[in-house]
């Protein structure tokens, strides 16, 4: 494993309003961030429904929350997925809370980079994923 010491976070769904939007966190703080936002204990590969709360205790949204313990995750690190309503302002508020709790903004492609560095994806798979995401044709 690459031994990444920083936790990263990003909105993982396309920009714009949608029924569901996902905020993803990867790194050593992922579980703690999830437990702080939900007020619940998280178990690996177990989905929960929870209110996500900000630092003042106010409810941000209802969400489905999934925690994947590394190395059994996409990046090979601890990963948190917060599946909330897809309002961009709401997703940005959730992302702000993740930053407040210690994660930094992920660079474009950084989740896949970590997957590659942790030998969860080979170069061909990483490049194919990037091509799929940036593709403009059918």
Regions found by a protein language model. Give the residues of each.
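A glycine-rich (often HGG/GG-containing) alpha/beta subdomain
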Residues: 1-138
């Amino acid at each position: 494993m690459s031994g990444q010491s920083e936790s990263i976070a990003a909105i993982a769904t396309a920009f714009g309003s949608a029924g569901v939007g996902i905020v993803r966190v990867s790194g050593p703080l992922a579980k703690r961030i999830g437990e702080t936002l939900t007020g619940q204990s998280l178990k690996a590969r177990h989905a929960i429904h929870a209110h996500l709360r900000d630092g003042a205790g106010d409810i941000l949204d209802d969400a489905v929350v999934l925690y994947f313990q590394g190395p059994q995750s996409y990046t090979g690190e601890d990963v948190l997925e917060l599946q909330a309503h897809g309002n961009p302002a709401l997703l940005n508020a959730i992302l702000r809370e993740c930053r407040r709790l210690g994660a930094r903004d992920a660079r474009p492609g950084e989740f896949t980079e970590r997957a590659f560095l942790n030998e969860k994806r080979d170069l061909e798979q990483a490049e194919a994923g990037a091509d799929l995401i940036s593709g403009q044709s059918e």
